[in-house]
């Protein structure tokens, strides 16, 4: 075994907990420092009005056997398969997501549909050569008109910048290999392909007690293996060894300094670098990296499920909300026998936006007004509201962000005794499965002396083998 024995993990989200669990199983002493009072990070589940809800929609899907095996090891049989239904709301019309040809044709009308097809054909005949930005990347695959209808407004709500200023990496990671042709083929030739694009997956595994149940159980297992989780314990800074033989340290906000053999950090990379004695150039690069915040407005609705989807994407520019989750349509067990429906409207902003500090009653009033505007809920059906603010949810892939991230990546990678993982820590737009994989491989680098490049793991990661979770466990898929 590697001589490293005592490991500190900053953050109890999917990445940090997965690393801690694997190391604890291998006999390491692990201590987790979590700034909040709960585990799970963005994937935690909370109790609200007698029901269980997540911080927005958190489906789980992976084709990596290591991730799926860990997920099943933790959750056991306490999950159900959910048939996914998500649609796009645009100008008071619902469009199937992923695209179905007839649905789009009737939804947009013959004239608009003809223009969309013409625009798509033009993009195939005369593609724009420089695909550095999101708008060009998507337009080349869907046509400019479909881009303007189904991508532009939503993306600009989410990121708070023009699509011309959004790096193509976002599209390449999230909708890689997907185009209008592929979407139509998937809709028309059902079952033609054994491997669906992740965006098109129509069934997913969901724990009976919410997405966060996986991480609650993982935390229990870590504790039973001798690990320690410190709640409400934000880390101020990481102090790395200056001389050979010295241990890296963490400094708490109270000023306490603790030594470890290795530190795994999932705290925001900007915060990590900003509080370390690093060269000015590295600090300047880190300061150019920004995160987007989320405001979640939950509404208790006295009605049966207002719509059949698990969530809908709101592309209408006249509404500020970008996504609406309906927790009535996940699994019955999270309802705890309650008849009311809980909806969650998502809004996105920066720290500097006045919206971020808007009072709770104003946010609830705005969300109530907007859900009425959609026509999904009647005026008198909203009975209560609750606001949760989640800072630094989304790493913003502004055009040219890599020229700032790569020097920071290289600098941190060369530091002994430190691993950086997770959506916050690595500035990667990860799903749960990629953060879990980061944690697993970070643990292997320590316990097995592996040399996994953790920076390579994100939604663009290619798996050597493929499997998926089904109602009866793992199902292996032939990649040939």
Where are these regions (language model features)?
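N-terminal Rossmann-like FAD-binding beta1-loop-alpha1 element of flavoenzymes
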Residues: 5-32
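Conserved Rossmann-like nucleotide-cofactor binding loop
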Residues: 15, 38, 270
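Glycine-rich FAD pyrophosphate-binding loop
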Residues: 24-47
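Dinucleotide-binding Rossmann-like beta1-alpha1 core, especially the glycine-rich loop
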Residues: 49-126
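Active-site/ligand-binding neighborhood in enzyme catalytic cores
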Residues: 93, 114-237, 241, 248, ...
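Acidic, glycine-rich loop-and-beta core segments that form the ion-binding/anion-interacting portion
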Residues: 229-276
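C-terminal segments that line or cap access tunnels to active or ligand-binding sites in enzymes
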Residues: 260-262, 269-419, 425-430, 437, ...
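Active-site-proximal substrate-binding core of FAD-dependent oxidoreductases
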Residues: 447-480
């Amino acid at each position: 075994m590697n001589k490293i024995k005592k490991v500190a993990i900053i953050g109890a989200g999917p990445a940090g907990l997965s690393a801690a669990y694997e190391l604890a199983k291998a006999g390491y002493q692990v201590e987790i420092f979590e700034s909040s009072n709960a585990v799970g990070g963005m994937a935690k589940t909370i109790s609200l009005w007698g029901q269980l809800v997540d911080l927005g929609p958190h489906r789980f899907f992976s084709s990596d056997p290591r991730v799926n095996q860990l997920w099943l090891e933790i959750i056991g049989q306490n999950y159900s398969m959910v048939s996914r239904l998500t649609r796009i709301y645009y100008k008071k019309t619902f469009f199937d997501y992923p695209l179905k040809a007839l649905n789009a044709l009737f939804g947009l009308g013959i004239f608009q549909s003809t223009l969309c097809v013409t625009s798509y054909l033009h993009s195939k005949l005369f593609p724009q050569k420089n695909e550095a930005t999101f708008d060009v990347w998507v337009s080349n695959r869907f046509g400019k008109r479909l881009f303007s209808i189904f991508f532009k407004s939503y993306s600009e709500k989410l990121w708070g910048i023009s699509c011309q200023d959004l790096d193509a990496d976002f599209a390449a990671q999230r909708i890689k290999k997907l185009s209008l042709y592929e979407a139509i083929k998937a809709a028309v030739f059902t079952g033609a392909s054994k491997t669906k694009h992740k965006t098109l997956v129509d069934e997913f595994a969901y724990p009976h007690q919410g997405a966060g149940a996986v991480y609650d159980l993982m935390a229990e297992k870590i504790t039973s293996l001798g690990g320690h989780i410190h709640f409400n314990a934000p880390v101020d800074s990481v102090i790395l060894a200056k001389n050979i033989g010295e241990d890296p340290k963490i400094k708490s906000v109270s000023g306490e300094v603790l030594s470890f053999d290795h530190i795994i950090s999932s705290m925001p990379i900007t915060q990590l670098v900003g509080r370390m004695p690093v060269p000015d150039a590295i600090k300047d690069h880190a300061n150019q990296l920004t995160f987007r915040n989320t405001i979640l407005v939950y509404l208790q609705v006295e009605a049966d499920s207002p719509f059949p989807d698990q969530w809908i994407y709101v592309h209408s520019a006249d509404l500020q909300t970008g996504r609406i989750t309906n927790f009535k349509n996940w699994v019955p067990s999270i309802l705890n026998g309650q008849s009311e429906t809980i909806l969650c409207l998502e809004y996105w902003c920066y720290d500097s936006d006045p919206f971020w500090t808007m009072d709770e009653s104003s946010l609830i009033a705005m969300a109530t007004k907007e859900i009425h505007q959609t026509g999904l809920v009647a005026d008198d059906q909203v009975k209560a509201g609750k606001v949760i603010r989640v800072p630094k949810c989304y790493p913003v892939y502004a055009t040219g962000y890599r020229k700032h991230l790569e020097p920071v990546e290289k600098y941190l990678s060369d530091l002994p005794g430190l691993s950086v993982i997770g959506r916050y820590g690595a500035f990667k737009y990860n799903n749960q499965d990629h953060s879990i994989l980061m944690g697993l491989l970070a643990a292997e680098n320590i316990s097995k002396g592996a040399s996994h490049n953790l920076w390579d793991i994100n939604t663009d990661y290619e798996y050597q083998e493929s499997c998926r979770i089904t109602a009866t466990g793992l199902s292996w898929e032939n990649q040939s």
